[in-house]
Amino acid sequence: MRRALLTGIQCHACRNNVVRSFVSVSGVTFMPLASGSWSASQTRPPPLSRNFSSQHAKLFSSHPSDNAEVAVDPMPEKDITEETVKPPEEPEEHIPWYLQEELEATTSHPLRKQQPLPPLPENPPPILNGLLEHISIDLGLDDISLLDLRKLDPPPALGANLIMIFGTARGVKHLNVSADRLCRWLRTTYKLRPDADGLLGRNELKIKLRRKARRAKLAKSAKSTLTAPDDGITTGWICVDVGTVEGGQFRKPEEEARKVGFVGFGTFVQGTRIVVQLMTEEKREEVDLEGLWRRTLERNSLENEGLPQPQAEEPPQEAGDIHKPSSVTPAHISHRVSHAAQISVNYEQRRGISTGSRQNRDLEEDGLNYAPINPDGTIKLPELISESTPLTSLTSRLRNISPYEAIYHLGQDVNDTNSTTFLEQFYRKLSKAPDDLASAQRIKLICIAIMLHHPGYGKTDLFKVTQEHFISNYGVTPPQFLEILDALLSFKPDLTSDPPNLLLPAADMELALQTIDHVGLRGIDLLNSTVWMKLFVGASFRVPVCPVRDLMNAPVIGNRTPVSLDTYETVNRVQTRLLKVKTAAKIELSANEYLSLLRVLFDHEWYSMFWDTWEEIALAGMPRDKSLYVFLFQLHAESDGWEGWKSTLLNCIPMMERENPPVYMDRELAEVIARCLAIAHPEIMDRVERNEPSPLVRLWHRCRIAVEKEVPLRGAQNPPSTMS
């Protein structure tokens, strides 16, 4: 029965308890083994197998052995009595496993080690720490950063006491799922009402993806492709407005109320507003929203603390001029004036026949006297102004004279007020004029000097005077703003440096962008074609370029200047963003602005975008007249590298007569078309000599006939002079 009972119990603990119960009935007692009672010879136990077998043999034996008690030394009676006198200890209460409290894991999450959370700002709201941990650990967003915009004054459009969090999602699906879970978590945990702009719901995203797949399947069956630029799914950007939470306000309302002379409307914001910007990696790099707010915060902190604005890191090289400000006095300005650059009255860059060798000669060596020289060596110029000349007409007089004379009248530098008659009269009238008019006229004077590449007038000087004008709350008109922007974005490329200086310095562009920010706060329209075109041209190369990987060993390709591939791609990224702004804002360009855009695209070898813009002119309803076609062929005749698009260019020739009004070929058009033919088909002369019956040969003969005739064909107006 005992064996059957033991074999029927499978649990080892139960079997042990049953054995103990039977052993207690049989009279065998279990004595505790005292480690201190063993002798020195008994400290090492026998082998495990022998000990186990002998002990079990004695335990389950029915005949007690005589030496059964030898295994254990008897305890002294004194010790037994002491144990009996000692009160029994209360046994610890047994707690079942289902009632035991689980200890939280103290090990940190592996993502937290790889992606540390940004440090909390001063006086953070209580929700901020938990929100950051939820975004990083639970949602799995990367590259988390935090911007404290509570000190921004005036506050941003999103609200006062703003804290902005940025996070990068791994894809479009991860972006939508993370934003949806974040909103649900905020509603459930903190009872907030977040607003997510750009979020597609769970079912909405599935429906859109299903519809997109269905349209793609239908388009594939119809042997066509989907050409929709934006399907509304891949926005890559979701803005979650958490709302206003308690705590964390930067200024206390009672401190603001104690301000002396405080006048305003509205109420104080009790709490902090939190906004979470979730983007994909590509969208975050393209928008650079974090960098925009960071620069705005830095400029605002400097303004509020009364510190000077950030200037250009390098000494100002105005308009790309490589000359440094000189300390030459007007008495010795004759040599400096002789080397000034020739600039047209409207300050536009024009291409023409180079006469640099003649312009760079000294006045004495060339024998040309632009102005009489006094016996003491100074330039004797006619009086530019008189006592009766009004202040508003003084700066306009500088535009009506040659650049050499204008540079002389402007004196040594921006601090010069009396070295010339013009400056003496100008600042004398300036002291008697109203403050706003005086500030505007001084800005205009510095703008003219910068456009003339005067070495003593810098763009930082113009920015400083403009900031004083803004701080004084003087009015700014759109023409005045455009004049300031032209001066800040003016640049003269230097092809003699190593490497060539072909781009506007980043410091000059930063000054222009800061001016645009200030003007935008005054209500002036910035999303127009004029401002956009100036920024687009200012961020581009000013000469035809070609990208190369090895700039040191790059060969010369026609008239194109080699530039490094990294610089070329950086400029193209900026221009791509500006083109997206133009498309999103629906900016319409004028005819002259289209010409500037075409030139920049052609100089950058953006031939695909170039021809798309050419077609855009016709779609905009603008007539493509003779001047536009002359510009098109002249642009291709001056450069090369476009041979892959020669068929597209030659297809424009039959399109001329289909324009409204038609454009007929005359001598001017025939000359530039013939030059383009020679570049696109170098073997054209051999084919003409063989008199091949091809369209190219017929076009060449047509151009030859138009050139030989001294009058335009088919009644074209204004025939050009005969080509020798």
From Swiss-Prot:
Keywords for the protein's UniProt record, in alphabetical order: Membrane, Mitochondrion, Mitochondrion inner membrane, Transit peptide
Principal place of residence: mitochondrion
Organelle transit peptide residues: 1-52
UniProt feature, compositional bias: Low complexity: 308-319
Stretches the record annotates as Disordered: 36-76, 300-323
Function: Probable mitochondrial mRNA stabilization factor.
Protein family per UniProt: Belongs to the ATP25 family.
PANTHER family cross-referenced by the UniProt entry: ATPASE SYNTHESIS PROTEIN 25, MITOCHONDRIAL (PTHR28087:SF1)
Name the record gives this protein: ATPase synthesis protein 25, mitochondrial
Native species: Blastomyces gilchristii (strain SLH14081) (Blastomyces dermatitidis)
Organism ancestry: Eukaryota, Fungi, Dikarya, Ascomycota, Pezizomycotina
